[in-house]
Amino acid sequence: VWELTSGCACCSTKADFMSSLLAIDNTLNPDFLIVEPSGIAVLSNIINNVNNVGYERIKVLPPVTIIDAGTYFKYKNKYEEVFMDQVKMASHIQLSKVENMTEEELNTIFEDIRKINQNAEVHISDYHNQDISYWNSLFSGELVKMESSDLIDVKKKMQNVSYKNACAKNPAVLAFFLDKLILGYYGDIN
């Protein structure tokens, strides 16, 4: 987990966000990087920021927006601009906290989402009960990759990661990193 703790990835800390993407890609070389912005992030800005990195290894997969069904209309009205942007930009929309809602309430929300975004796949059933094919479908089958024997060999051999010329921007960033290190966020440190 790589956390931007101050500012917004879609506006005020855009440069930090973009440099973090490159740093993560160049140091960890992940197959996938999941960006989980706060609920008030402007999704279209984040997508534009990722696309503006201009690095062929980094591309945006179909965005997934998760919406609390119980507060759907409240937040749609209270944070209209951000809410509408997240719904319009999503390829998949998953309702959460649906277990105590009636089918009629869920269908009302579904119809309202359809008025905003006719193309998104809208999932109104409880995601806790879904199988692996559901989760794979969120990313058009791209989430689970077959492991090659080369990749398995690399995983077995990899025991450490080192950085050259690493530095913290300020003491607060260093303290944050050291706290995460002590808490085991970066694996077993011997």
Report residues per predicted region.
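Short amphipathic alpha-helical segments
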Residues: 45-48, 77-78, 106-108
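A short alpha->loop->secondary-structure connector
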Residues: 51-60, 83-85, 110-117
